[in-house]
A protein has these predicted regions:
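An accessory alpha-helical subdomain
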Residues: 181-187, 192-232, 237-240, 245-257
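Generic C-terminal helix-cap and adjacent flexible tail
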Residues: 259-262
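Catalytic cores of RNA-modifying enzymes
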Residues: 1-206, 246, 250
């Protein structure tokens, strides 16, 4: 029996009803699927039955014999670190430019970089992913909630985010220290052009840089802009100098970016 490896963040899920629910929620019938970290094939066994073509990245080469039991002529596994691979080239070669749907029980320690890589690659259209509950709470959070932060706002600018299911830690082997959550991300048409998107991301990150500081102080410190101009832009949104970042929704940050830079 394969022993989970701590250095790879391995925790294996075995409840077949839950596994099937996760795959069903991804709606991948006759679609192209990329799986990250298939592990012992818990999700893989259901994905390959539905998917048109299947590709996976698995960092642990010792799982090769186990995973090859699930493969057919329309499926393949690359035994490499997803974050260290030339993913765009691999996807172009294998899927020939067609849309792809990402599924994965993500290692907690690399969840955020994987999500940002998903956002960067145009071919990847949706992601149905298992994440640490604390991270999932941030992903689905809304303004004025304690869990709402820069990551929440940036992610929700690029995608529609929905909760699929909460997963108790006791459903894993070995049992991790935290609960999990399955969320689904669906990329959407964005509202700003590319140059303004970079400004939007900068503004959001700076706004949350020091949560105890006001929005005005964070932005005037971080942006090379006149403080009076920033305050004028805030007032045009019916905000004042005491406003803090967590009270702005995604659309508010979009409008603020346009006020400052259009």
């Amino acid at each position: 029996m394969h022993q989970a490896k701590k250095r790879f963040g391995q925790n294996f899920l075995t409840d077949k009803n839950l596994l099937k629910k996760i795959v069903d929620s991804a709606q991948i019938h006759d679609k192209n699927v990329l799986e990250i970290g298939p592990g012992l094939g818990a999700l893989t066994q259901f994905i390959v039955k539905d998917a048109q073509k299947y590709l996976a990245y698995e960092i642990d080469y010792s799982l090769k014999d186990v995973l090859e039991n699930f493969l057919s002529e329309d499926s393949n596994i690359i035994f490499q670190d997803f974050l260290e691979s030339d993913v765009t080239n691999d996807l172009d070669t294998y899927f020939k430019g067609e849309p792809i749907h990402l599924i994965g029980n993500l290692p907690y320690y690399i969840t955020t970089p994987i999500i940002f890589k998903f956002l960067e690659i145009d071919q990847l259209k949706t992601a149905t992913i298992m994440v640490q509950k604390e991270v999932g709470d941030r992903m689905i959070s809304k303004k004025n909630l304690k869990s709402y932060n820069a990551f929440s706002a940036i992610l929700q600018y690029f995608t529609d985010v929905r909760l699929v299911v909460n997963v108790n830690r006791k459903m894993f082997n070995p049992v991790p220290k935290v609960d999990s959550m399955v969320v689904q991300l669906t990329k959407k048409e964005t509202k700003l052009d590319k140059s303004l998107e970079l400004k939007f991301i900068q503004i959001v990150k700076l706004s949350f840089m020091h949560k105890r500081k006001t929005l005005l102080n964070n932005l005037s410190t971080g942006l090379n802009e006149d403080k009076a101009k920033i305050l004028e832009s805030l007032k045009s949104l019916n905000l004042d100098e005491k406003t803090r970042a967590e009270s702005l929704g995604v659309d508010d940050f979009i409008t603020l970016t346009e006020k400052l830079y259009k």
